[in-house]
Amino acid sequence: MVDKRESYTKTDLEASGRGELFGAGGPPLPSGNMLMMDRVIKMTEDGGSHNKGYVEAELDINPDLWFFACHFVGDPVMPGCLGLDAMWQLVGFYLGWLGGEGKGRALGVGEVKFTGQVLPTAKKVTYRIHFKRVINRKLIMGLADGEVLVDGKLIYTANDLKVGLFKDTSAF
């Protein structure tokens, strides 16, 4: 049974990483340091730029986050690939929220632009995912556009984020 709410806490997201939120067949989020959000504040089946679904989530920033110590020494910045991964994570989370089953895998992105950075002095990163299409056949796949904001300023955009859910990933 899918635990379908409009918002989720960090505890809920950690439960997803253990496979407890969307049931045994639902796609888990990454756990530990690779979980790139602290809360989901909005999920809808409509809304967003394309009126086909919307997710908004947040990550609290503090100088003690693991990546600031190593990327880069003396010039700490959140790796842009982690923001991109967060957007893929949210596409997969949405597919599980809709009742999709399987293991989530990022399938690509059409275009990514970085126009800013996340520094340890920032307070909050906001992720916004605007769904364009969800395919629910043998393959369950989400197609979406995403935005990353730091303290309200748009710093990354991604067009055509693709995530699929797979029952068997052995041949992937």
From Swiss-Prot:
Tell whether Lipid metabolism is among the UniProt keywords.
Answer: yes
Detail the disulphide connectivity of this chain as listed in its UniProt entry.
none
| One cellular component (GO) term of this entry | cytoplasm
Q: Which Gene3D superfamilies match?
A: Hotdog Thioesterase
Query: What InterPro entries does the record point to?
Result: FabA, FabA_FabZ, HotDog_dom_sf
Major localization listed first in the record, in broad terms: cytoplasm
Pathway as given in its UniProt record:
Lipid metabolism; fatty acid biosynthesis
Q: Which GO terms describe its biological process?
A: unsaturated fatty acid biosynthetic process
Location comes to: Cytoplasm
Record key words, sorted? Cytoplasm, Fatty acid biosynthesis, Fatty acid metabolism, Isomerase, Lipid biosynthesis, Lipid metabolism, Lyase
* Active-site residues, Swiss-Prot/TrEMBL: H71
Q: Which domain of life is it from?
A: Bacteria
- Identify the CDD domains for this entry: FabA (cd01287)
Q: List the catalysed reactions.
A: a (3R)-hydroxyacyl-[ACP] = a (2E)-enoyl-[ACP] + H2O; (3R)-hydroxydecanoyl-[ACP] = (2E)-decenoyl-[ACP] + H2O; (2E)-decenoyl-[ACP] = (3Z)-decenoyl-[ACP]
> What would you give as a GO molecular function for this chain, any one?
(3R)-hydroxyacyl-[acyl-carrier-protein] dehydratase activity
Enzyme Commission number(s) from the entry? 4.2.1.59, 5.3.3.14
Function, as annotated, reads: Necessary for the introduction of cis unsaturation into fatty acids. Catalyzes the dehydration of (3R)-3-hydroxydecanoyl-ACP to E-(2)-decenoyl-ACP and then its isomerization to Z-(3)-decenoyl-ACP. Can catalyze the dehydratase reaction for beta-hydroxyacyl-ACPs with saturated chain lengths up to 16:0, being most active on intermediate chain length.
Q: How does it assemble?
A: Homodimer.
Family label = Belongs to the thioester dehydratase family. FabA subfamily.
Q: Could you identify this protein by its name?
A: 3-hydroxydecanoyl-[acyl-carrier-protein] dehydratase
